[in-house]
Amino acid sequence: MKVFNTLTRKKEEFKPLVAGKVSMYVCGPTVYNYIHIGNARSVIAFDTIRRYFEYRGYDVNYVSNFTDVDDKMINEARKEHTTVEKLAERYIKAFMEDTEALNIEPATLHPRATHEIKEIIDFVQDLIDKGVAYEVDGDVYYRARKFPNYGQLSDQNIAELEEGASEHINEEEQSKKEDPIDFALWKAQKEEDEIAWDSPWGKGRPGWHIECSVMSTKYLGDTIDIHGGGQDLEFPHHENEIAQSEAKTGKKFVNYWMHNGFVTVGKKQEKMSKSLHNFVTVHDILKQIDPQVLRFYMSSVQYRRPINYSEDGLKQAETVLKRYQNTLRNLDARLNDENETLEDNGLRDDLTQAKAEFIEAMDDDFNVQNALSIMYDLATTLNNHLQKDQVDKPALKRAKKLLIAWLEIFGVSFKEEQAENDDEIEKLIAQRDEARKNKDWAESDRLRDELQAKGIVIEDTPQGTRWHRA
């Protein structure tokens, strides 16, 4: 299996720290609002990657945090006349509801920054003791220039970093920092109503970057296999995480850095973001469309590539999903009919080849486009085979299992629960079959209309009548 490593800018053979196990840390949301489609891209992309690792037999330890204290949290809490704690609780609950609807597997652990304050303070103090951090008026900064490879992840040199920092730093920070490229590890409390904790440097709160360094190393160890997040986190967030973590532990922080592409919108394909006011929240969009359609659509583009969010794209995803659903229904119908089985070596060879090609595609840095193309072709092969008078039922059982497993990698699961009126529907189907047998077309049409009024779709096939709910 090959994974594109942002740090080296190339695909590398994936070799986990422990055979058969994968440690993954993915930066989670800052919980001051509902997540938008752009935020969901990262959640969906890394859930798909996690599911594929599990499909390949790996045991995945997946940690994804909640940033429940920072400037955005404080400002939003003031605006809504509530506390940071209550704001966080509300939007963590909303996040879990939205991601459950999108069939995202819960992380092994969802740590929260505010629950790790002691560990954060200890981490910062360790960096001060090592001489790579310093305190000024209750704020603590990291000496970025002390870290030899600072800028490597985002492919920037010190001169570029200095120029960028000089443009964004305010006068107060400039007077405190030894160097414009230094960044905050701990922020002093500015106002009485601001959330804060006691520390050796006075009341304050953690900086954003230190939170993830502490939570990832606490729960996954000093070195982890994979650290993921959106491309916008490469700098400064992930760059700073590397500097902090490696300065503290003296060990390589992450073996494979993975970053997902943006969601864009409109003809100009602008990045979806709250700052541009061009975003759609998952909470709102799920009132209008099937969560499974959104999930499949967002999974259909290789994780590093941008995806342009559009209604046409969603409709196309819905059409493809219906095709897979119908294929699985037709498979069930043929597996349950009374016709004898007929061995088909051609179909068996097709299944073996399709599985090998699917794995080859996904092993190549999770190339979902190629993998989905193989899935689509397999569905075509199966639908053609299902038209035959006699089918290879053992091969079809294998095909059904394969297709279901592949769809589950993309978070798709077609589970039709038996309704209370299924027995009634079966009786009406039997009555209609009898009417057709007796060539009583008027009664047959009447029963079809009655079934349609109940939301039942009927298919008349050479193997008998099939039905499903619309």
Curated annotation (Swiss-Prot):
Amino acids binding Zn(2+): C27, C212, H237, E241
Catalytic reactions on record: tRNA(Cys) + L-cysteine + ATP = L-cysteinyl-tRNA(Cys) + AMP + diphosphate
Protein name: Cysteine--tRNA ligase
Cofactors required: Zn(2+)
Biological process annotations from GO: cysteinyl-tRNA aminoacylation
Cofactor binding notes: Binds 1 zinc ion per subunit.
Transmembrane intervals: none
Residue window of motif 'KMSKS' region: 271-275
Protein family membership: Belongs to the class-I aminoacyl-tRNA synthetase family.
Motif ('HIGH' region): 29-39
Classification via PANTHER family: CYSTEINE--TRNA LIGASE, CYTOPLASMIC (PTHR10890:SF3), CYSTEINYL-TRNA SYNTHETASE (PTHR10890)
HAMAP family referenced in this protein's UniProt entry, alphabetically: Cys_tRNA_synth
InterPro entries in the cross-refs: Cys-tRNA-ligase, Cys-tRNA-synt_Ia_DALR, Cys-tRNA/MSH_ligase, CysS_C, Rossmann-like_a/b/a_fold, tRNA-synt_1_cat_dom, tRNAsynth_Ia_anticodon-bd
Enzyme Commission no: 6.1.1.16
GO MF terms, alphabetically ordered: ATP binding; cysteine-tRNA ligase activity; zinc ion binding
Binding site for ATP: K274
Pfam families tied to this protein: CysS_C, DALR_2, tRNA-synt_1e
Gene behind the chain: cysS
Subcellular location, principal: cytoplasm
